[in-house]
């Protein structure tokens, strides 16, 4: 089993994710510069947080049009897993690999703080080590993290089946007050139609060691590894 963490110009969470995967989760992981592409076979790819290309045009818009994303699409069409975190989630949305878009927060400021999430599904490659309804605590750090689903049609209906995480309060209540950025129905983690691509705004790598105050995010990565082990 081998993971790749793709580095774009402006990525700044790439080494954090690689450290958690390699050193904390024990998953062999390579840092891959985007111009090199996925030159070997990988079981999973992570697009990390940061500010790829300075977030010019729109967050993730330029990175989504780089050649390495052709490799990511091929992996997603097969049996591989793709996780996009924060800026990586924006890139996945811009690439059309998940439905909807991530746009400027309802209160248009950068938000950086812990957030509570409710696990909406535990039958996905990214959440299989959680239980549906679990409340987890993972930091957020974004200005363009407000999720908006497709305007109409089948893709809009698909979103209701593709929600992995919602913002909530400490007791699991999904309320307007627990929604830090104005996301539609508090959605902050959305899956592809096939379920093997996840875009999430919170940073699980920042909640993967006790010293960081929470280990809740580690189960995202360990779920991916477990899924690949079971389905290899």
Residue ranges and their predicted role:
Residues 73-77, 102-232:
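Amide-donor transfer/coupling interface in amidating biosynthetic enzymes
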Residues 4, 47-51, 92, 175, ...:
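Amphipathic, alpha-helical segments enriched in basic
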Residues 1-85, 93-99, 104-111, 118, ...:
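N-terminal beta1-alpha1 cap of cysteine-dependent amidohydrolase-like domains
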Residues 88:
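N-terminal Rossmann-like NAD(P)+-binding domain of SDR-like oxidoreductases, especially those catalyzing
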